[in-house]
From Swiss-Prot:
GO terms for biological process: DNA catabolic process. Bidirectionally degrades single-stranded DNA into large acid-insoluble oligonucleotides, which are then degraded further into small acid-soluble oligonucleotides. InterPro entries: Exonuc_VII_S, Exonuc_VII_ssu_sf. GO terms for cellular component: cytosol; exodeoxyribonuclease VII complex. The lineage of its organism: Bacteria, Pseudomonadati, Pseudomonadota, Betaproteobacteria, Burkholderiales. It comes from Polaromonas naphthalenivorans (strain CJ2). GO terms for molecular function: exodeoxyribonuclease VII activity. Its EC number is 3.1.11.6. Residues 1-17 have a biased composition (Low complexity). The gene is xseB. Residues 1-22 are annotated as: Disordered. HAMAP family: Exonuc_7_S (MF_00337). It comes from the Bacteria. Keywords: Cytoplasm, Exonuclease, Hydrolase, Nuclease. This is Exodeoxyribonuclease 7 small subunit. Heterooligomer composed of large and small subunits.
Amino acid sequence: MAKSSASSLSSAKPVAAGPDASAPALPVSYEAALQELEGLVSRLESGQLPLDQLLAGYQRGAQLLKFCRDRLEAVETQIKVLEGTELKPWLQA
């Protein structure tokens, strides 16, 4: 049932940082990216993934994290513009 490392590597989904037809597409929304990232973290933390899938998962996670951070930064920039470039303090109840 164990695969050789060469066949395991060839069966892994490639994840590339640049535009690549074989790389998974980025989610359409922050929420979708966050949901995928949370599921990925759970699978990575389970300790049940083979090494090649751990690497692919880590790479995908880094891609999703960058997407989420970029979206948050874009929204923060828009809020700054709407608020006159100065954010109001966040009041927690």
